[in-house]
Design a protein with these regions (language model features):
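Cytosol/matrix-facing amphipathic helices and coiled-coil assembly/linker segments
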Residues: 2-30, 82-165
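Internal alpha-helical transmembrane segments
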Residues: 2-81
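The feature identifies polytopic integral membrane transport proteins across all domains of life
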Residues: 23-34, 56-64, 124, 158-163, ...
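Transmembrane alpha-helical segments and their cytosolic interface motifs
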Residues: 27-46, 152-178
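Structural signature of hydrophobic alpha-helical transmembrane segments
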Residues: 184-196
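Interfacial loop-to-transmembrane junctions
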Residues: 200-227
């Protein structure tokens, strides 16, 4: 009895210590990268305009227009992308469903051969395939997972993807505009807040990539800062030329 309890305790400890990150990033990845995209693009846009020595009102309007246009563009693109992917998956599932209905024996043999190729004994592979093929819906799910790498019960929603992308982009793009909306009369507070936001986004990305937070933060700060520097230089150049 003591041995069984000890083995159970060791198994429980192993399970607690043997956890893996979600390599797909879950909701965090698209949210962080959407916000980062909004922050970098709107910061670069506003910095470029500021480099042209325009009025404060022009910079604010540019930032708000960039936020709105970018967020809607991201949402539309994400909706189209996810909807197209979902339609493709549904089409593949329809093909598999039709094959299971018309040629059940062939599909069962296919599944058995798949398990055999993974090292399962032939007799056991055939028995497992036979048992799994008794329920048509279960058979469809198994074939989708094993042959197509698809989870029929976990298809992404285009609407959720679009709304998430819109919100994340808008949130990131709002950072360089926010100081102006709160009464700032120069571009420096907006730039400072945006740079802090860049470092913060990079630090959060470290949760997905498993890199050190300071390295990820500094890398994103450097990339965003470089984009802002280039657009500022271009804005200054063209502003001087036009002026």
């Amino acid at each position: 009895m003591a041995i069984i309890e000890t083995e159970a305790a060791l198994h429980e400890a192993h399970r607690d210590n043997h956890t893996h990150r979600d390599v797909n990033g879950g909701w965090l990845r698209p949210a962080v990268f959407g916000a980062m995209d909004g922050l970098v693009s709107n910061l670069a846009l506003m910095t470029g305009v500021a480099g042209g020595s325009v009025s404060q009102q022009t910079i604010v309007v540019t930032g708000l227009v960039g936020l709105t246009a970018g967020a809607f563009s991201m949402a539309a693109g994400e909706y189209t992308s996810v909807a197209s992917q979902r339609e493709l998956v549904q089409a593949e599932l329809d093909v598999e469903r039709r094959e299971l209905r018309k040629h059940p024996a062939d599909e069962e043999r296919e599944l058995a051969e798949l398990y055999e190729s993974r090292g399962v004994e032939p007799c056991l592979a055939r028995e497992v395939a036979k048992q799994l093929s008794k329920d048509p819906e279960q058979a469809l799910e198994i074939h989708a997972r094993e042959e197509l790498g698809i989870d029929p019960g976990d298809l992404p929603s285009p609407l959720v993807a679009a709304v998430s992308s819109f919100g994340a982009f808008a949130l990131g793009a709002l950072l360089p505009v926010l100081p102006y909306l709160l009464g700032a009369d120069t571009f420096w507070p907006a730039l400072l807040l945006a740079l802090i936001g860049l470092f913060g986004c990079g630090a959060v990305v470290a949760k997905v990539t498993a890199r050190s937070w300071w390295f990820s933060g500094l890398r994103q700060l450097a990339l965003g800062g470089a984009a802002a520097g280039v657009t500022y230089a271009l804005g200054s150049l063209f502003g001087t030329a036009v002026g």
